Amino acid sequence: MANAKEIKTKIASVKNTQKITSAMEMVAASKMRRAQDRMAASRPYAENMRKVIGHVAQGSLEYKHPYLEVREAKRVGYIVVSTDRGLCGGLNVNLFKKVIADVKKQREAGAEVEFCTIGARSAQFFNSFGGQVSASASGLGDAPKLVDLIGTVRVMLEAYNEGKLDRLYVVFNKFVNTMAQTPVIEQLLPLPKSEEGEFTHQWDYIYEPDPKLLLDTLLVRFVESQVYQGVVENIASEQAARMVAMKAATDNAGELIDDLQLVYNKARQAAITQELSEIVAGAAAV
């Protein structure tokens, strides 16, 4: 058994760690609330944009944009959104597992795969995973702007325009609630059709002044908005996961302190008992 002094040092060390994890929990809770506000503000735009684009994909268009054409999936691209930092439980691990499972299916079907990473963790993982990383962005902070992502996203869009990609997906953690974040893979290109079920009529649009100019701008904006929404959702998920992880760490530290305190008391009691025994033995010898 360790002596009382060593145990006391361990208790002090665990208490210091507990203070740090408790502070990180409170910071994460504050950041999560702000991230939720940003997510709630941008989610309606992204969802309605997806609905409109879904109807466009169903419609009979006078100008057939390349993003609407379904090609054989020989090369597939993934825009993977992760965190820059750790200490957020299994958030990144679960996301990477989902991507790897989907990549395995694509490769079994004979497709080649490349990645665009947003977040330092995904860049580290996919560089070691062995996939081709065509573009990356990191250090976006807790409140990224669309302009911070445009350059990275455009690399994948240009690859799609040049026929180097036949499918493009975005992967991120969707915020469900504080306790639940779900990794999702959403198709960006070719444009997914609306999921609202059967239509009672055909969706046709009149484009003014020029359908090509309008669709070229609108469809690029759609892809950018979906990636941005994925980043915002992932940040909210990150802070929620970090808050839960730090709370668990704080609680575990408390339990460890209690256990160490019990061991300390036993060690101290044993030391006192030994001293008394030595005193009694010395007195008896005299």
Swiss-Prot record:
Which Pfam families does its entry note? ATP-synt
For this entry, list what GO says about its biological process.
Answer: proton motive force-driven plasma membrane ATP synthesis
Predominant location of this chain?
Answer: membrane
User: Looking at the UniProt record for this protein, which Gene Ontology cellular component terms does it annotate, in alphabetical order?
Assistant: plasma membrane; proton-transporting ATP synthase complex
Drop me one GO molecular function for this one: proton-transporting ATP synthase activity, rotational mechanism
Gene3D superfamilies noted in UniProt: 3.40.1380.10, ATP synthase, gamma subunit, helix hairpin domain
Compartments, as annotated in UniProt: Cell inner membrane
Keyword annotations of the record: ATP synthesis, Cell inner membrane, Cell membrane, CF(1), Hydrogen ion transport, Ion transport, Membrane, Transport
Tell me the PROSITE patterns matching this sequence: ATPASE_GAMMA (PS00153)
State the InterPro entries in the record.
Answer: ATP_synth_F1_ATPase_gsu, ATP_synth_F1_gsu, ATP_synth_F1_gsu_CS
Top-level taxon in the UniProt lineage: Bacteria
Q: Which topology term describes how it sits in the membrane?
A: Peripheral membrane protein
Self-association state and partner proteins as the record states: F-type ATPases have 2 components, CF(1) - the catalytic core - and CF(0) - the membrane proton channel. CF(1) has five subunits: alpha(3), beta(3), gamma(1), delta(1), epsilon(1). CF(0) has three main subunits: a, b and c.
Which family is it part of?
A: Belongs to the ATPase gamma chain family.
What does the protein in this record do? Produces ATP from ADP in the presence of a proton gradient across the membrane. The gamma chain is believed to be important in regulating ATPase activity and the flow of protons through the CF(0) complex.
NCBIfam families of this UniProt entry?
Answer: ATPsyn_F1gamma, PRK05621.1-1
Q: What is the name of the protein in this document?
A: ATP synthase gamma chain
**Native organism:** Shewanella halifaxensis (strain HAW-EB4)
Encoding gene, per UniProt annotation: atpG
